[in-house]
Amino acid sequence: MEALMHLSGDPQHAFRSIHITGTNGKGSTATMVARLLQAQGLRVGRYSSPHLSSITERIEINGEPVSEELFAEEVLALAAVADMSEYPASYFELLTAAAYRIFAVEGVEVAVVEVGVLGRFDATNVIEADVAVLTNIGTDHTDQQGDWRRNIAGEKVGISKANSVLVVGETDPDLRDIFESEPSASLLFAETDFELTDDQPAVDGRLLGFRTPRGLYDDVFVRAHGSHQAQNALLALTATEEFLDAALPDDVVAEAFGELTLSGRAEVVATEPTILLDGAHNPEAAQALKETLDVAFAVSEPRVFVLGALEPRDPADFIENVGIGPGDYVVAAAVDSPRSIEPARIADAAEAAGATAETATNVDQAVDRAKVLAGLEGIVIVTGSLYAVGEARSQLA
């Protein structure tokens, strides 16, 4: 990756950056940071993965995906550059290099960059970020054998640099020595250096209070569902303050958080019936979805789940984590992937949990059927994978 960047003129040095890693919450935190910076009047790039509907979603400037023409132009140019290198470039390396080139050419002042996998050896880690953020350490990308949490933490914290501020959302005290062993100008820990002072469900989101190293913020409405999003907002606010070296004006925070859209993350895209999209891509994310449904959508009945999942996910485990059971409906669908789990297998697992289940040929068909089952007062939850969410979002959003 370094060779590819050097042959491209090292565009990653043309802008400042905030680098975000962690098992869950990377995308939401990155979106929140980008919105806070944009509300401050900065020209902001955001690089994320994976995408839901279009690959251009991965590279945004001021909240808008880059054009297909610009995306194709830069990827093709970089593919030609990569051919001159003795080291072949991977798909993700080409996309990352294209993002950095686009940010440089388009005059981005700060890029918010989401790690692809882990961190230390990730393609994104050629930037010298001003602020590094580690959201948490969960069970994704690991077989959970041996000292896996310490190993994963050591890889993720590898995005920290000697002159950067490291903002840590993970609160396990047994991992603190790993974070402290990495080079950084300063370390900030959740629950010690910054914390939530209030967290209440509200209509269309949550009402939060924050204590950060630079100030107190009270009665902040965040347009996002779930207590996990409160933690992401806290991390985003702290990281943004550290980047700017100042507290943020209350009106900037209110604007950024109050107008937030988190695509595919407890995202409500329709009413009558309510239709909610959430990828819930690992056990922790599935449990977070359960909490969101139990708290923010408890009065919505019946609940109809459109489930489309990929191997090697265990449908029974997912159904248990999300809390699907008696009284719920499940419409199981195939997604557009060779790894798609057979809908009948998902339906069998749902029925074993006490739900009423049926199958559909694809996600579009499943959503149409789910809307009928839900009626005007119910809720349709599209989940199980980002593939299912992306296909539904293309139909609905």
What are these regions (language model features)?
Residues 33, 119-130, 393-396:
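Short Gly/Thr/Asp-enriched flexible loops that form oxyanion-binding sites at enzyme active sites
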Residues 173-178, 182-186, 204-206, 241, ...:
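C-terminal helical cap/extension that packs against the catalytic core
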